[in-house]
């Protein structure tokens, strides 16, 4: 009988811990990525995307051939943009334009990542593309990994 009560107690204790630490589990932040040259990303520059609540989000931009699409890549949870450099390397080699976006709270960026705030970040990315590139929204390829795949889908509907 003690085993049953111990098992029930352990179950509820684990549920309690999951509840308490759910934000850390879902929004597992990462450190600063370094510079694009550290990842052999040729002709890729650091850009800062300003959000409506005045945060500056570090992102990397490679300007390629304007006749090819712009790949907008949103990294997933527990990563920063440097961790995903290998995934965009092939597009840069084919001379695509690439914007590798880092979210608030990730990659050394300030801010608190929440679902609402990640949507704000996606809106800021759209505005940055409109104001700083020649691409039209129909020429974008939007890739959202893991945590931010929903934000990428939302961005694609705009």
Residue ranges and their predicted role:
Residues 52-132:
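Membrane-embedded segments
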Residues 135-146:
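Alpha/beta-hydrolase fold nucleophile elbow
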Residues 144-154:
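Glycine-rich nucleophile elbow surrounding the catalytic serine of serine-hydrolase chemistry
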Residues 3-50:
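An N-terminal hydrophobic leader/cap segment in hydrolases
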Residues 19, 157-158:
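Solvent-exposed polar/charged
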Residues 91, 155-156:
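Aromatic pocket-lining residues of Rossmann-like dinucleotide-binding sites
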Residues 43, 54, 95, 137-139:
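A generic structural signal for alpha->beta connector loops
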């Amino acid at each position: 009988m003690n085993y049953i009560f111990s098992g029930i107690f352990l179950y509820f204790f684990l549920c309690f811990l999951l509840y308490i630490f759910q934000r850390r589990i879902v929004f597992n932040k990462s450190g600063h990525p370094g510079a694009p040259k550290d990842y052999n990303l040729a002709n890729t520059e650091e850009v800062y995307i300003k959000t409506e609540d005045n945060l500056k989000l570090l992102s990397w931009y490679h300007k390629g051939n304007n006749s090819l699409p712009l790949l907008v890549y949103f990294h997933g949870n527990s990563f920063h943009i440097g961790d995903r450099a290998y995934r965009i390397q092939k597009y840069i080699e084919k001379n695509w334009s690439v914007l590798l976006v880092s979210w608030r709270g990730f990659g050394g960026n300030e801010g608190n990542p929440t679902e609402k705030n990640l949507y704000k970040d996606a809106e800021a990315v759209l505005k940055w593309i409109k104001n700083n590139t020649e691409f039209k929204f129909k020429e974008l390829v939007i890739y959202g990994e893991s945590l931010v795949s929903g934000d990428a889908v939302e961005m694609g509907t705009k």
